[in-house]
């Protein structure tokens, strides 16, 4: 159980997944390349390490150094590298011109793990539009409102007031 994973999250979700669901997830590749785009969940090396930021001993999220970010991209020739995991929308341009983008989260605007807390301040779905231009990749981060009521009701029904609050407000108090 990696230190930044919420065991309650797994406990809530696992009973809802059939063996077929779990098999499908296990069969997914750790990374994927589509043309000039490289995709991974967290970093190219593993599924739980944050690529663009880290959690300080005090529980704050801080940016990783550019050399650390770039070292994780070594050997990847694609010009656009997509990652996630942190639920924080951000982009970093590497010294060689490649761009790393985390689009944010569509359905989890915050969470409180054992080691840190993430809040976005709004319940909106977040994603990124990406266009390849003559001068490189153009990124437009989007923040879109949606009806969170069904997810909030489900969180409350599952006795997760923390999830209900963050889904409804984008905040954890």
Q: Which residues does each PLM region occupy?
A:
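Active-site neighborhood of divalent metal-dependent phosphoester bond hydrolases
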Residues: 1-35, 45-46, 51-77
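Active-site environment of divalent metal-dependent phosphoester hydrolases
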Residues: 45-47, 80-94, 108-112
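Metal-dependent catalytic neighborhoods of phosphoester/phosphodiester hydrolases
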Residues: 1-3, 92-95
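Acidic, His/Gly-rich catalytic cores of divalent-metal-dependent hydrolytic chemistry
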Residues: 93-173
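Short solvent-exposed loop/turn micro-motifs enriched in small/polar/acidic residues
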Residues: 23-27, 84-85, 121-123
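Short active-site oxyanion
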Residues: 77-80, 138
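Active-site-proximal beta-strand elements of phosphoester/diester hydrolases
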Residues: 36-43, 100-104
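Divalent metal-coordination and catalytic microenvironments
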Residues: 25, 41, 85, 104, ...
């Amino acid at each position: 159980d990696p230190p930044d994973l919420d065991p309650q999250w797994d406990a809530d979700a696992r009973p809802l997944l059939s063996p077929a669901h779990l098999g499908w997830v296990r069969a997914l590749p750790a990374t994927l390349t589509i043309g000039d785009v490289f995709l991974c969940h967290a970093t190219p090396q593993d599924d739980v390490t944050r690529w663009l930021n880290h959690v300080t001993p005090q529980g704050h999220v801080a940016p990783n150094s550019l050399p650390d970010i770039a070292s994780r991209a070594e050997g990847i020739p694609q010009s656009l590298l997509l990652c996630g995991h942190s639920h924080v929308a951000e982009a970093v341009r590497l010294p060689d011109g490649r761009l790393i983008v985390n689009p944010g989260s569509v359905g989890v605007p915050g969470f409180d793990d054992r080691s840190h807390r993430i809040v976005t301040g709004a319940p909106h779905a977040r994603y990124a539009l990406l266009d390849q231009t003559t001068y490189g990749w153009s990124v437009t981060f989007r923040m879109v409102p949606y009806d969170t009521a069904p997810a909030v009701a489900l969180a409350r029904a599952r006795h997760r007031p923390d999830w209900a609050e963050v889904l409804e407000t984008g905040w954890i108090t």
